[in-house]
Amino acid sequence: MNNKQLNLIANKLVNAFLKKKVIAPIPNKYTQKIFNAQKLRKLCESKINKPIAGFKAAGTAIPVLKKLREKEPFYASVYKHNVLKNNKSVKINKYTLGIELEICYLIKKDFFNFNKKISKKNVKKFISHILPCIEVVGYRQRKKGIKSLGDLCSDFGANVKFILGSKKKFNN
């Protein structure tokens, strides 16, 4: 892949992301393979200077992974300007794929200083709060449907907005 071309595509996607615009679809060679899509996503995220609210795991449904012939999900950054409080309105365009009900976990800061191996048992002690979340899923490109997991990955994880509910204290 040509770095100059990749940079040009990344600039278009970042511009669409920041200005809430819809652009022409990016070429399939950047989205067909998850490795190339990850590379594009990381380049795009490095060009954005807005604060990050957290991260999302995407492509976690096993049937979807099998259908798209992928082995593992990916993650993407969630930016603060895309996170809304409850009862806020969201503009939806025709390239919105739908909405998903998600669960959001607030993680304590000492999680990032933990030097031991993280397991299912000890991860619970790092969760401070849990809250419901509605994710508006869509593209910033004139594209319909999902042909590969790279389609979602390359477009900032296809997260348009997150609407957060009220947080509840997490009991271990």
Briefly describe each language-model feature range.
Residues 2-172:
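Catalytic-core "active-site belt" of small-molecule-metabolizing enzymes
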